[in-house]
Amino acid sequence: MLNRRTFMTTAAAVGGAVALGRAAFAADGWQAKYPELVFGAIPAENGTGVADRYAPFMDYLSKELKTKVTLRIANDYAAVIEGQHAGNIHIAYYGPASFARALVTGVKTDAFAIDVNSDGSKGYYSVFYVLAKSPVQKIEDLKGKVLGLVDPNSTSGYNMPMFKLNSMSIDPDKFFSKTLVTGSHENALLALAQGTVDVAANWWNADDDSNLTRMLNKGMLKGANGAVLKKEDFRIILKSDLIINSPTAYLDDLPADAKAAISQAFLDAAKKAPEAFAKLSDGKNKPWEPITNKDYDKTVELIKFVDELNKKKA
């Protein structure tokens, strides 16, 4: 089974980059030192889904940068952090909290592009879902129930939920009968659909743009009886304050001209490779915009706050 120090690279994940890797890229400039760049992505969905979503974009990057770009999908959020720390992942797509964790733990990485929503905003929310048939109407009704979270390095699936519960004077260890860390946003909703958890934390941009809607569009959610679930089978009982959108970051020690080329390739992607760009977000996002590490200072504060909460409980 994959763990933090191992990654999977499937044929589908590499996509067009497999063929491109055999092509003769120009071996001058920074490409001579970096005949291959590795792009790492956090496991927001299952491996096959990520591979299919990113394959055309890896093809575009390989052509644009004139060097092979390979997609590697981590089994958990920490694997992306550790991959960049070890220098094995040159470009990484993070969640806000996992990026903040990378900075706090000393990873020399620089954010250069931020996701932009269809309405031009650059943030999203953490929500608590329950099944619509559940009698639960508010968080306080969940005493003694099972809470489903995502990953300790997830913003919307762990850190923000922990912050919100604390602001309501709720200690998850005492309030819930059990807290299940499911490993991904998809797994959290699958656990809710199957009745394994009574409430699940997840990300939400808008009514038509969330992990829930993506999974529903794929027919991935079925109840314990095997029936395919619909949007009306789920209900949000709590929504967080706005969270800054996810960044893409490259290693700080890459050559300056390599970083400039990578950044420009991302900023130009929506125009130069519209289909590949659209596939990344199911057509929901606008072109990337520049971002810096400084923009994630509040997220760094958030994870440090949650770290202190966990230390007090230990």
Explain the meaning of each model-derived region:
Residues 29-100:
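Extracytoplasmic small-molecule ligand-binding "clamshell" domains
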Residues 84-85, 142, 192-193:
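Hydrophobic residues within well-ordered alpha-helices
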Residues 6-26:
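N-terminal export signals
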Residues 146-148, 152-255:
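Pocket-lining segment of extracytoplasmic ligand-binding domains
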Residues 41-42, 118-127, 218-254, 260-263, ...:
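Periplasmic-binding protein-like
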Residues 30-56, 62, 250-314:
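An extracytoplasmic/periplasmic, membrane-proximal ligand-sensing/linker region
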Residues 115-170:
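A conserved helix-loop-strand patch within extracytoplasmic ligand-binding domains
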Residues 74-77, 87-105, 114-115, 201-213, ...:
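Beta->alpha turn/N-cap motifs
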